């Protein structure tokens, strides 16, 4: 459960990014967050990730107060989160395999466990044959799949996706959101920021609209109780990719680990593994 009560956020330059936000997201929901650039969407996500702290009000996630959370506890809290960014944030000198494995290594997972899980995860997102590729050898859609695999390899309770379709075409956008849809079907909470009206309209989920730092609309009338047919979303997407998407919810049930911060030192190749 995620709960914001009367949350405001002001920066040192006087900018008020959030103003009296009240919000409750239950475990297992899929929520789209929409709004113009500068509306406050990114600040909302940063507070959820504990990158920022509310100036006023209270924030509780998974029964933990983020306002009073100690710095040493933040990495452990973030292990419950899987983050998917618009710009992918893959480590350029690491292969696809190692980018996903890195999420496990930073929490001290054993190499045997990693060598079993990562190929399985990559297979489920349709990238088994790309395991040895570097990020610059992949298309935008493939890079975003790697980012998604990295976010869910440790079975996060909450997926936070910040414009995950911003750098891919329409067809791949639907593919990525349908993957998130299937992950959500297994009980994972998904929060996705998007500017795409087409995606929001097509996927029939709760829509929270932010304007000038305030929630101006929280619409559940768009929620669909019927699954979306493959032909509506994927068109002529190949069968293997469809199968990979349909199986995405299966593999995340099998894992109980979680993800921690990626530090600059770790990006250089160091890990926390003992």
Residue ranges and their predicted role:
Residues 148:
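Hydrophobic anchor residue at the start of the ABC signature
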Residues 94-102:
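Short coil-to-helix segment of the ABC ATPase nucleotide-binding domain corresponding to the Q-loop/switch region
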Residues 134-138, 142:
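Conserved ABC ATPase signature
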Residues 57-65:
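Conserved ABC transporter NBD signature motif
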Residues 153-157:
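A short, proline-enriched helix->beta-strand linker immediately N-terminal to the Walker B motif
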Residues 49:
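Helix-to-loop junction immediately C-terminal to a conserved catalytic motif
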Residues 159-162:
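Catalytic Walker B motif of ABC-type/P-loop ATPase nucleotide-binding domains
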């Amino acid at each position: 459960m995620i709960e914001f009560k009367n949350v405001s956020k002001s920066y040192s330059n006087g900018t008020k990014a959030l103003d009296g936000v009240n919000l409750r997201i239950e475990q297992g929901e899929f929520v789209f967050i929409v709004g113009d650039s500068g509306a406050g969407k990114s600040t909302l996500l940063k507070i959820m990730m504990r990158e920022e702290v509310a100036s006023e009000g209270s924030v509780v996630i998974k029964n933990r107060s983020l306002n009073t959370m100690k710095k040493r506890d933040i990495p452990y809290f973030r292990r419950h989160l899987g983050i998917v960014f618009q710009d992918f944030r893959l480590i350029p000198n690491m292969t696809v395999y190692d980018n996903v494995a890195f999420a496990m290594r930073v929490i001290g997972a054993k190499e045997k466990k990693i060598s079993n899980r990562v190929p399985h995860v990559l297979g489920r997102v349709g990238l088994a044959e790309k395991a040895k590729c570097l990020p610059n050898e992949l298309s935008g859609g493939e890079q975003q799949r790697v980012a998604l695999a990295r976010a869910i390899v440790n079975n996060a309770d909450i997926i936070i996706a910040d414009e995950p379709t911003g750098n891919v075409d329409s067809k791949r956008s639907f593919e990525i959101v349908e993957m998130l849809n299937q992950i959500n079907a297994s009980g994972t909470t998904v929060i996705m920021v998007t500017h795409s009206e087409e995606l929001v309209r097509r996927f029939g989920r709760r829509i929270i609209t932010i304007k000038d730092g305030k929630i101006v609309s929280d619409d559940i009338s768009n929620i669909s109780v019927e699954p979306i047919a493959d032909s509506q979303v994927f068109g002529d997407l190949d069968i293997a990719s469809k199968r990979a998407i349909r199986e995405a919810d299966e593999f995340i049930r099998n894992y109980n680990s979680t993800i921690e911060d990626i530090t600059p030192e770790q990006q250089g190749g160091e890990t926390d593994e003992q």
